[in-house]
Regions:
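Conserved catalytic cores of phosphodiester-cleaving nucleases, focusing on short active-site segments
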Residues: 71, 81-82
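Basic, Lys/Arg-enriched alpha-helical interface segments
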Residues: 1-66, 75-79, 86-120
Length: 120
């Protein structure tokens, strides 16, 4: 019996950021995304960790190397990649900018997705 994979939605800014990565980093990110699609919410450390100090209760980060991708599982059982970056050399300050941005993008995503779901 095969386990169904989780859908992953990617905001445009994250998609563009991933596309611009060097080959080695891109490959690490793709492997991490494959693991996320396969493991879903059961995926844990060291690849996934929970983010504190956010208004989103279940905000998490995907952690391939020094790359961080903030994501959340939405009410439709999908994951949405909200913010991505390489926090090398800025281990604390990166979150001060990334968390509010993730919260804003998630709010926008929820509104758009709810409209789409309502139209079906």
């Amino acid at each position: 019996m095969t386990t169904p994979e989780w859908d992953i939605y990617v905001v445009d800014e994250v998609s563009e950021w991933i596309d611009a990565l060097d080959d080695a980093t891109h490959e690490r990110v793709v492997q991490a995304l494959d693991a996320l699609a396969e493991g879903g919410p059961s995926l844990g450390r060291p690849l996934v960790d929970r983010i504190a100090h956010s208004t989103i209760a279940n905000l998490k980060e995907l952690r391939p190397g020094t790359v961080r991708i903030l994501f959340v599982f939405d009410p439709w059982r999908s994951s949405i990649l909200l913010v991505a970056g390489d926090k090398a050399g800025q281990w604390t300050s990166w979150y001060e900018e990334a968390i509010p941005l993730a919260e804003q993008r998630y709010e926008t995503y929820l509104k758009e997705r709810a409209q789409e779901e309502g139209d079906q």
